[in-house]
Every structure is written in C-alpha cells, then in structure tokens.
C-alpha cells in the first residue's frame, strides 16, 4: 500500500501555489514545486481555433463529469509523453483519488460509444480550477474535454 498525502495537505499546497509531483511512476518521493509563473486560461476570452471548433460541433462523443475519475487519472499516468515519463506515481494517484472522494478533484471524460477515449482531471478550490493532466486515445479528444470544461466553468461563473 502506498503512502497517501492527506487531503488537507494537498489543499494547503494548492493555496500556497505549490503542487506535488513524482520524478517518475516508480518513485517513492514526492517533490513540491512552486513555479514563478503559472499558465492561466482566461475562460472569458478563451480562443478556440476554428478547425477545432468545427470538429467539436460535429463530434458524436458523449461527455461526462466525474463518471470514472480513477480511470482518467490512471490513463493520464500511462499516457505517451514526449519524454516517456510521468509525474503520477501511486502516491499521487491514491492521494488524488481521496481528493476526488472529498469532491475537490474532478474529471471530464470523453466517450465514444461508452468507451473512454479522452479525459482530464484537476483540482477545484473556491473559484479556481487547477488542471493537472489529460490524455487522449483518439485525436483531439482531450482538447474536446478542455472545451467542455471551459463551458462548464463559464456557466458556473469561474
């Protein structure tokens, strides 16, 4: 059984601008990072390329929220990355599952005929949503999840 970062600690980290990462999937060490700059998506002025928007409007996928958080974070852990690495180890996975059970971590999922083909997850504190990771098994499916998420955040006045 892996160690788990308590939910209260994770929330405190985010409030202080820190986020936890492992060096790789097998690491037993969690490092805290505090970047000088964080990427912020301005949801009220969110630019969607025309080609992507047309594809999104034509898609026949189903989107769900928090339907299968564990599969999303697991698929994010296994996603092919350019550097062949992941920052999601068993400690991160189990800790974020607990955060999800406390309704502080959420997933957006893209399904094609009931098969999970893309998704993202992140942490919600107050009026902020911190996107953590995404995966795509079909071209653009994770981008579609981001578009869906932005629409939800706008609707809920983030």
Which residue ranges define each predicted feature?
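N-acyltransferase acceptor-side catalytic subdomain
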Residues: 1-158
């Amino acid at each position: 059984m892996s160690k788990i970062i308590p939910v209260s600690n994770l929330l405190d980290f985010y409030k202080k601008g820190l986020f936890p990462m492992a060096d790789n999937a097998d690491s037993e060490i969690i490092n805290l990072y505090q970047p000088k700059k964080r990427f912020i998506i301005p949801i009220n002025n969110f630019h969607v390329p025309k080609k992507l928007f047309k594809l999104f409007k034509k898609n026949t996928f189903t989107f769900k929220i928090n339907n299968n958080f564990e599969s999303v974070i697991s698929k994010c852990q296994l996603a092919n990355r350019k550097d062949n690495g992941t920052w999601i180890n068993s400690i991160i996975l189990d800790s974020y599952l607990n955060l999800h059970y406390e309704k502080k971590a959420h997933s957006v999922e893209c399904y094609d005929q009931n098969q999970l083909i893309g998704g993202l997850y992140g942490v919600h504190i107050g009026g902020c949503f911190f996107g953590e990771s995404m995966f795509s098994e079909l071209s653009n499916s994770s981008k579609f999840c981001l578009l869906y998420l932005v629409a939800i955040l706008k609707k809920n006045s983030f």
